[in-house]
Each structure stands twice: as structure tokens, then as C-alpha cells.
Amino acid sequence: MKARYLFPKDYMADPSANVFNGRLYVYPSHDWDSGECFDDDGGHFQMKDYHVLSMDDVMEGEVTDHGVILDVKDVPWAEKQMWDNDVVEKDGKYYLIFSAKDYNGVFHLGVAVADQPEGPFIPNADPIRKSYSIDPCVFKDDDGKIYCYFGGIWGGQLQWYKDNKALKCEHLPEGKEDPLPSRVAMMTDDVQQFAEMPKPVVIVDENGKILPADDPHRFFEASWMHKYKGKYYFSYSTGDSHYLCYAVGDNPYGPFTYKGVILEPVVGWTTHHSICEYKGQWYLFHHDCVPSKDTTWLRSLKVAPLYYDEEDNILPVK
């Protein structure tokens, strides 16, 4: 089946898809043309609010825009750049985990809470303690434990940190050095803080060797976790090589063995996604810049069916 542009009426990106109460919800970032010039630190991505979309027929049905669910002006600690977000449910409450810059220009992760998946979400006064960087994915395992995956290089500031501590000088690994990994931390029972210090998400090849910094399939940003037949599928963007890739592990922390490319480079610099099952069918949600004629900060949501082969490998999405 041909891919669908999910919401042509507006520019949105970085979709996080979740199923709540039998309906599929997509939590994207919200692009607009701020007039900022393109730069490698993402200054042209000046998103300032979040919407949520919902539907009960992914490929052909009506998509409802529930409007603004959180605005940067309502977040006490955040100044600008409401980048990626995700939502998880626990005990009838909905927790939106999002990334934004504080008044010192530093990215952190925040929490906002709602009584229903379409919001509105009420933000906490402060970001998650010890949080940094961008691109949160919140994954609820079968035992009810909730994990937050996060991290992004360059504009996402992951190179500013090592062992969860800020560096005096940023470090971007090169060549055969180990790359900068995504991070994962279990959340507290109230989904307000990290329950532990974040751990590196290690991606290895079939021989158990860490993919090096110069491998075009190494992690860059856009962590996503889903579970399929008891295995943990960690997927991610490779950033400057523009792939969506995935790796598979036996537990939420990994290590994860690299398996392959899900999506080849699209029109536009970034590629960011989520993977979700709804009504027995798996889907890949992502974005590209075809409708905006390759204006990289004006992206459009897209969805396509996703399939596995008989060995549980994800088939590339065309």
C-alpha cells in the first residue's frame, strides 16, 4: 500500500505514535518558518508548541487535530525550541515527555501531565533532574516499567556530555572511536523523574563489536523502542547519513545487535520516526520535505505499513 501524507494542512514532524483507548494518537513537533537561517545546530527549528492528531483508520480515515496541547510560553523552565516529544499512560494519567531549551540555551527533558490523551497537558515547573539532550521516547514494557530513551548529536548537544556529566569541551568521536550512544533510564513510578542514572544504549555488529563512529549506520538521534515477539527493537536515525536503522536486543537496556535499514534517505535533512501496531497492522510513521519543496524546517508527516519477514526482520519500507 502506498504511503500516506497524514496531515497535509500543516507542517509537522518527529511523530510519536501510540494507541490509547482503542484509538491511535500521533504526537508530533510543529514546524513553522521562523526566518532563522539554516545551521548545523538546528537553530532554524524554532518549534513553539505541540499538537496531537488522532484517527481510527490509519491509511484512509479522517485525521483529527485536537489543537495545541502544550505551548512553550506555559512551560516555566523552557525558553524555546520545543523539539521531539512522546506520551505514555500510567494509572489513567498521560505523561508527555518533551525536549526544549532552557534560558541558558541548554536542552533538557520536561514532563507535562493530562487526564486524557488529547490533553491539555500541564507542565512541571522544572525539567527532569539530570536530564539533557533531546528526542525522548517513553517505552512501557509488559511488566509496567517505563523507560525513557533520549539523545541527539550536533544541535541535540549529546556531545556536551560524558558519563552523564557536562564536558568542558564538547567531543565528537571520529573514525574507529566508539560513537556517542543514545541513553536510556527507567522512570520513577510516578513518571516524574529518572529512577536511575542514564545508561548508554550500545549497538553492536553480529560479532559483538560496537559500530564505530565512522559507520554510516551508527546512532545519531531519534531513538524509538518497540517490542515484537518478545524482542526489543531499538530504531534510530543516523543523522548526517540520513538512514532509519534498527537493532534488536533481549532486554530494554541492550546491547542491541544491528540488523539493517528501515528507510532510505528522504527529501529533507532530518529523518525521525516511530513504529506502532494498530488493529493488527504495524506502521512506520515518519516525515519528509517533499510538500515544502525541500525546505528542511517545514516537514510533513507520513505513514506507511511496516512488515516483518519469517525471521522477524523488519522489511525496508519503500
Where are these regions (language model features)?
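Carbohydrate-active catalytic/glycan-binding domains of CAZyme proteins
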Residues: 1-318
